[in-house]
């Protein structure tokens, strides 16, 4: 410790900034020089879980809460008005909102640029359903990065003049409900915003527009409108966007999709089981235009795909594949796409996979998470689930060079599909197979690994492809072309 004590104050303050506030406090007993370092620490990380124990009785909880409040007050008092760069506060065990908001205002007044809040105002003496954060936070001139996590409802203060965070570049919100009004007006409060992540999000209106000229990275993990209802329309006017992670109930329309610079997209268009059933009904294109006609409602998803057709990397979930089955004939051509990832589920079909593969003329890398999927009469020629004359035609025309199969369970159906891929992908040079690590597999049976290895070795002899089989991070076997 003597060597550390002899370091310059600035160096010691920098070292302490990597520790939680409670651990920093322990150093203050070493000497007066360590006590004075509080003012030099530009980063504070405060976590009430290090103080509070929910299993204690009510009286004990109240006493410990007060000691936590006293500790935070003391820490902020020691720092006085010294500048602070980052303030992280995890406070989820019922601290009164007056205390929390006072701490937030303290660091705002000192010019904090990075604010990370994980809070819950479920105080025993408070009956409010909404968590009211201090108004000063919504008009800060110094905030560059803001992260809010909350299990309840957060009321986003707009005020008479509206929210104004002119320096904010990164915003992350994870809450069951955020009261903010129209999305377009909400985003106009952040003129230089570059990164936005919204989790557990519910749209306030049935017609919404995500509009930002500066946004480069966008993640929306939504739950549709109130009561889990599909939005009527969602528009994206984000001309500078490079990355999109969009997970939400599929909207009935996508009138505007302005994403000309987009490079990577992860799309999860969530559909309910009853909607899937109606999508698969025979002659569904003859159905009348009514509220229950999901074919007409979701057919406009092709507008979303048209808007992202310049991307280089695309990941699609099993639900998304089902929705895309409605627009196979109008699927855009993805001329720049190099990497395609698809996720399969046994209750969802592959009807859209052949159209996707045909419309990716420069595809190099295909990732398939799970081979097992729902077999239908529209399953297409990408798999060998149904005997057909044109089986494998979409694969033969696909230029993919590398295929990665994740979540392999060792079933005969999967083994047959792997053989189908090796025979049909004419340009394939490499295939990696990764077993399922969480769910049940056939590998629990004696001799299963050896049997799979034997079959894969036979497949390898009929292909011009290197095949490797990895088990829990270790190379189980690799066969190379001769």
Swiss-Prot record:
Residues 1-47 form the F-box domain. Keywords: Leucine-rich repeat, Repeat. LRR repeats lie at residues 122-150, 175-200, 222-248, 313-344, 345-370. SUPFAM superfamilies: F-box domain, RNI-like. Pfam families: F-box, FBD, LRR_At5g56370. InterPro entries: F-box-like_dom_sf, F-box_AtFBL13-like, F-box_dom, FBD, FBL60-like, LRR_dom_sf, LRR_FXL15/At3g58940/PEG3-like. It comes from the Eukaryota. This is F-box/LRR-repeat protein At3g58930. It comes from Arabidopsis thaliana (Mouse-ear cress). The lineage of its organism: Eukaryota, Viridiplantae, Streptophyta, Embryophyta, Tracheophyta.
